Amino acid sequence: MTKHVAVPIPEVHRYSLVILRLAQVKARTGRSRSSIYADIKAGRFVAPINIGPRAVGWLAHEVDEWITARIAESRGGAR
């Protein structure tokens, strides 16, 4: 039996949720498939969501937040 969990959607994203597929995540981050999945496993990259029986995607705002955090780290803003 499938277990459903209610996930609150932040108000700012309620009507602008965009799901990215792997090719789009690779293009946006400049990273390879293997490095993306290695970092997901290590907890260093956002996890994908299931969008079908054999398909996953990433929420664009989560990927963008990850990119923003990397920029801040590289410029000494976050430690």
Where do the model's predicted regions map?
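Polyanion-binding surface elements
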Residues: 2-42, 61-74
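Short Lys/Arg-enriched helix C-cap and helix-to-coil transition segments
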Residues: 49-55
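Amphipathic alpha-helical dimerization/coiled-coil segments
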Residues: 77-79
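Short, solvent-exposed alpha-helical "recognition" segments
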Residues: 42-49
